[in-house]
């Protein structure tokens, strides 16, 4: 699927990838669900998230927290309270530390709670997307607080693209489980 360039495409991509991800999740075996994620033997998987996330709940919570970042950022800036997407004390160079904080915060959250939280937050994201026009979402310079990008690109990154990331990780875990 190509990167969305309209509100309809954005909503379609977000919901389609979310459904694809949920179909993949529904197909995970008990063994795949109960086996901790371990990508330490794959030298190509160097990014911090390959070590951070240990189970499906961790991935779902990561997606949920990035929805929350997006929702807070859009709402605050629409109200005239200009904040950056990545909240202080973090920035685009240190957001990995923020992701670890999200991970720590949710170690007592159950998988079912995480799934419910993610579904609810996706619904909120879609409702906010619907408030904007195509121009507001996909034209540069409409909102100063977006910087040199488009508002829509943030929505794509926090939804459809992030679900792709999750599916890639889940498929890698499934492959690891099959090898063992």
Question: Positions of the model-derived regions?
Answer:
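Short secondary-structure junction/hinge motifs that connect adjacent elements
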Residues: 27-46
